[in-house]
């Protein structure tokens, strides 16, 4: 059996590692680099990947694709995609299925196809080093990637000719890399992962359980559209504005100039991590009637920090939520690990140190830790490494839509995976022969506010009154965080299932706000829940009253029947509205209108039972029943209660 390689498929750079004996090793690419730019370029006669693609970007900006990971598993209409369209020199196009694809030389291509080119380069790098064919890999994804984005990453692996043995979360992989060579007691670590395009925070407990290293993720959170690329954009905007002030020329319409500006901004940002000031000098950036123009701007570290401070602050809110979800306070965190190239920025390091109240460790390579962790996980799967147990979690709650547009969770966020949970539901209408299972991901109580992952129908239910059929819905999440959903009619054994292969990702607003919105809108959600409960209660009352009215037949007077039917009509109208009080008052009215009918029905029932039981009652008069219990009651004063 060949080696299972570990690949960190990054937004900006990618990295590949293996386990040599019991030591992880990052493999250098053909250019000698330990990381490879995640850039793919299409020229007239070839496809370039990595450093060679990056080198020619200035002369070929519209066919050089970078930061494709930010599009993977996303819809074209997503806000973040629309924002990205304005920022990149290449063309983002709408696919037939509504996904965000790219258009290269008139040909539409899916993000997994582009990512597959980077994965092929990683695969070839490993094969050249090992001298043998590589067919299996563990690939990492941001912890906050949703189901669609994980699926798309798996697809990219398959396109690259790799069997993806496991998709694991980047912070978890980094914790594996950190924890494997650290002997010591149990500890809690916070992995702060700010990469090129995504941000994750995971709180992980590392414990020694009977000689086995156990890595348990307690909570995770993040933002899939926050990373180094955003820091670059702030600096690019600033440089373009400064140039416009000096020359009156707006560079934003010139892809060639913007590509040069992008490279210069990235270089300046890196330089400012170790120096206080740098010059951005771009001769012949453009020209007008008066001749060529040169860009020369001094940028200080303080200026860069003022441009990006809001982005760093934005990363702290997910940290707060992750701490809260894990049940830990910042003082209980033993170690802070920084992952991702953007964490080299002094401002990021100081803000994280202030937040957690301790300095982050400096012995973890932020560019390589994730790939090393993936390689360790690969060795665990192949059996080369034993005594390691990894317990990861699902980042967002998974639910189905139930009556009244309510999102009913089956699996809560931060549940350890793999996991399988079932819940029994029933029908909302009489003689309903089919149910639609609508699968959702997110934290809101209202179904429409969550991310729709897919839907399917379970048909062929035998006609029965509402509430009678028993439909068991099962959610099964595998170790890759990918979900299988099935629905089974318990009476007939009929079953329908779906592997959630949603083709879109969550937009920035959706993913960034899902958990935060759920908290901010707690009152709104509570109100909605109460309204939905009242509607369902009213619906049940209408159904029960109509059934009793039908059973009562001629025992109800014409006036009573008219009054009851009028009250039903009023209640049905109220159910359509959004006024909980109106629904409840109409329910009261219907209960009052139908009370005399109910009394007659009970009286008739009692009379029938009374006739049958009369003789027995006479025999039993004055005698206590055999099974009656004599009991003494003692009043307990409040002061005597223990």
UniProtKB/Swiss-Prot annotation:
InterPro entries: ATPase_NBD (IPR043129), Chaperone_DnaK (IPR012725), Heat_shock_70_CS (IPR018181), HSP70_C_sf (IPR029048), HSP70_peptide-bd_sf (IPR029047), Hsp_70_fam (IPR013126). The modification Phosphothreonine is found at residue 198. One of its GO terms (molecular function) is ATP binding. Keywords: ATP-binding, Chaperone, Nucleotide-binding, Phosphoprotein, Stress response. Residues 578-642 are annotated as: Disordered. Induction: By stress conditions e.g. heat shock. It comes from the Bacteria. Residues 578-589 have a biased composition (Basic and acidic residues). Residues 603-619 have a biased composition (Low complexity). Belongs to the heat shock protein 70 family. Acts as a chaperone. HAMAP family: DnaK (MF_00332). This is Chaperone protein DnaK. It comes from Hahella chejuensis (strain KCTC 2396). The gene is dnaK.
């Amino acid at each position: 059996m060949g080696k299972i390689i570990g690949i960190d498929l990054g937004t900006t750079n990618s990295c590949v590692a293996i386990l040599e004996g019991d030591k992880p090793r990052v493999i250098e690419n053909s250019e000698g680099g330990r990381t490879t730019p995640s850039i793919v370029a299409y020229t007239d006669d070839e496809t370039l990947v990595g450093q060679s693609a990056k080198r020619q970007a200035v002369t070929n900006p519209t066919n050089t694709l970078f930061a494709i990971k930010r599009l993977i598993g996303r819809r074209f209409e997503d806000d973040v995609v629309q924002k990205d369209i304005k920022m990149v020199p290449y063309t983002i196009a709408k696919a037939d299925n509504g996904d965000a694809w790219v258009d290269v030389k008139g040909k539409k291509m899916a993000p997994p196809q582009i990512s597959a080119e980077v994965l092929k380069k990683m695969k070839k790098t490993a094969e050249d080093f090992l001298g043998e064919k590589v067919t299996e890999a563990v690939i990492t994804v941001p912890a906050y990637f949703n189901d669609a984005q994980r699926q798309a990453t798996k697809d990219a692996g398959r396109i690259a000719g790799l069997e993806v043995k496991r998709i694991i979360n980047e912070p978890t992989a980094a914790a594996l890399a950190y924890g494997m060579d650290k002997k010591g007691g149990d500890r809690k670590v916070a992995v702060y992962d700010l990469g090129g395009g995504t941000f994750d925070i995971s709180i992980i407990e590392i414990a020694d359980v009977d000689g086995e290293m156990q890595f348990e993720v307690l909570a995770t959170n993040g933002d899939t559209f926050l990373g180094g690329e955003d820091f670059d954009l702030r600096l690019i905007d600033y440089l373009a504005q400064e140039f416009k002030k000096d020359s009156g020329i707006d560079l934003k319409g010139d892809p060639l100039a913007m590509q040069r500006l992008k490279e210069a901004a990235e270089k300046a940002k890196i330089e400012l991590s170790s120096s206080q000031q740098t010059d951005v000098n771009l001769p012949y950036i453009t020209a007008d009637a008066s001749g060529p123009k040169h860009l020369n701007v001094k940028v200080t570290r303080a200026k860069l920090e003022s441009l990006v401070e809001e982005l760093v602050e934005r990363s702290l809110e997910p940290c707060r939520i992750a701490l809260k979800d894990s049940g830990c306070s910042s003082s209980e965190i033993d170690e802070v690990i920084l992952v991702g190239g953007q964490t080299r920025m002094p401002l990021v390091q100081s803000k994280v140190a202030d937040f957690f109240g301790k300095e982050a460790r400096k012995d973890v390579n932020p560019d390589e830790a994730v790939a090393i962790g993936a390689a360790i996980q690969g060795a665990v799967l192949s059996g080369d490494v034993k005594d390691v147990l990894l317990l990861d979690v699902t980042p967002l709650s998974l639910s189905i839509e139930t009556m009244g547009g309510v999102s009913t969770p089956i699996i809560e966020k931060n549940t350890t995976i793999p996991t399988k949970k079932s819940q029994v539901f029933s029908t909302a209408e009489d003689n309903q022969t089919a149910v639609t299972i609508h699968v959702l991901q997110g934290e809101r109580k209202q179904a429409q506010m969550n991310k729709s992952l897919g839907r399917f129908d379970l048909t062929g239910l035998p006609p029965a009154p509402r509430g009678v059929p028993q439909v068991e819905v099962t959610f099964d999440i595998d170790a890759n965080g990918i979900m299988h959903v099935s629905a089974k009619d318990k009476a007939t054994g009929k079953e329908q299932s779906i592997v959630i292969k949603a083709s879109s990702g969550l937009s920035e607003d959706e993913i960034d706000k899902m958990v935060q919105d759920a908290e901010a809108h707690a009152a709104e959600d509570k109100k909605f829940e109460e309204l939905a409960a009242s509607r369902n209660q009213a619906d049940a009352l209408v159904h029960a009253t109509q059934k009793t009215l039908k059973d009562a037949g001629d025992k109800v007077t014409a006036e009573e029947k008219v009054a009851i039917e009028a009250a039903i009509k009023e209640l049905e109208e109220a159910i359509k509205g959004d006024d909980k009080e109106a629904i409840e008052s109409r329910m009261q009215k219907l209960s009052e209108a139908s009370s005399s009918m109910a009394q007659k029905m009970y009286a008739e029932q009692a009379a029938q039972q009374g006739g049958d039981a009369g003789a027995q009652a006479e025999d039993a008069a004055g005698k206590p029943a055999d099974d009656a219990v004599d009991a003494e009651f003692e009043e307990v004063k409040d002061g005597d209660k223990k």
